[in-house]
Amino acid sequence: MRTTVAILLVLFALSAILAFYPDTTAEAKGCVKKVDCVCKGKGKKNHRSMCINGKCYCLKG
């Protein structure tokens, strides 16, 4: 039981870390809001994005 809970916690933490990746092509520098980010990954424009501590991150998907 403990092992299962530990494995689930590790998987949850890894998925949370991998959910965001820095967008190196973001045109907004020093973004303040979600709308300031422009994501251009995988040939798509304007996917869901997030601004964390002034850096633009695109959500996978």
UniProtKB/Swiss-Prot annotation:
GO terms for cellular component: extracellular region. Disulfide bonds join C31-C51, C37-C56, C39-C58. Expressed by the venom gland. Keywords: Disulfide bond, Ion channel impairing toxin, Neurotoxin, Secreted, Signal, Toxin. This is Putative neurotoxin-D. Residues 1-19 form the signal peptide. The lineage of its organism: Eukaryota, Metazoa, Ecdysozoa, Arthropoda, Chelicerata. It comes from Lychas mucronatus (Chinese swimming scorpion). One of its GO terms (molecular function) is ion channel regulator activity. It comes from the Eukaryota. Its main location: secreted. It is found in: Secreted.
